[in-house]
Amino acid sequence: MKTYKQTIKRIQLLVTANLLFFVCAVNAQIVNAEPQLRWVDVKELCIEGKGWTDTKHFYDRFPAKAEGLIRKSVWDLSENSAGICVRFKTDATSISARWTLRNRKIALTNMAASGVSGLDLYVRFNGEWRWLGAARPDSVTNEKKLTAGMSQEVRECLLYLPLYNGIENLEIGIPLEAKCELPPLRPINMKPVVFYGTSIVQGGCASRPGMAYPAILCRRLDCTMINLGFSGNAICEPEIATLLAELDPAVYMLDPLPNMNSEMVKSRMPEFIEKLRTVHPKTPIILVENTEMGDAPVNPSRREGYSTSNAILRKIFEERVKAGDRNLFYIRGDKLLGTDGQGTVDRVHPSDLGFMRMADVMEPVLKRALRAGR
């Protein structure tokens, strides 16, 4: 009899335990259930960072007419969405994104997928842009949560697109009751800063799109940008100068030297600058020296190569200033990455630390150039 009662009691305890487990599991599912989202195509919001509207694909960086006029390698890179961003206003407590990439290669050997093909979200807080969240892709088509748990108040947000991949489509997901609207207008007289250069300008090898130096600078100065960085292909071709001259920027920043040998700098740079000056006689132009590579202190041959190119660029700058070009500015390269050799991932391409250091050196010069152009 005693054994029978003990058995019944054990069964009752097991049933109770299973019921409790079931109730807890259901409650957990209810608590953790994702809210239904409303998806907004970002084309309905404010797209910044595009220099031309007549592009072959919406998120391309060069106009459709450039295909066939420029080298194929440059055209292919122009399909990367570097520098393009979406600005919007929302009271959402969580923000998600779903996006489709154009290239299946979502990462590089020296650069993470989060920078190559990911999204990067900032929010304006107390008048400054602050990082809010990022989304790392797993495949060509992705759906990821950028941020959650925010208080419900209206905020201005800025979402950067991938640096080294193209975008087929992009949507922002917010809770059904939330708003997602056009942001406050930029000042009517604001013009973008146009950056032309190499993989470094394009953003290699930032951990996420917002850490490329053009993005850092334009957040700090609260201005718009057009990123025309082309990895391994910034060699100051006249066709590229013609395209750049079609734009109407506040400032041109030219940073192509890492892709050019000294003879190319000597023969091509003066003509490139002159093509811009012919169309924009007073627009400030900033010339940027090659950075000092990480192993330069113990590698004389490498140091000699970029030192020669820098000296030629300096001479071009001085000759133009002497001839009366008062809106030409210059950034030396020896301090751009710091002095400890810790600013790159592979001796050449900056890490996030390197990009922050570059922005620190460039910011005061860009400020002066922007003032000069007003």
Set out the residue ranges of the language-model regions.
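Oxyanion-hole/transition-state-stabilizing segment in secreted/luminal serine hydrolases
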Residues: 205, 217, 234-279, 290-297, ...
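Histidine-centered active-site loop/cap adjacent to the catalytic His
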Residues: 345-374
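Catalytic nucleophile-elbow at a beta strand-turn-alpha helix junction centered on a G-D-S/GDSL motif
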Residues: 190-214
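Short helix-loop-beta junction
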Residues: 214-227, 318
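Substrate-gating cap/lid alpha-helix
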Residues: 293-331
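Glycine- and acidic-residue-enriched helix-capping/strand-helix junction motifs
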Residues: 107-112, 203-211, 303-307
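N-terminal secretory targeting modules
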Residues: 2-3, 7-9, 13-192, 367-374
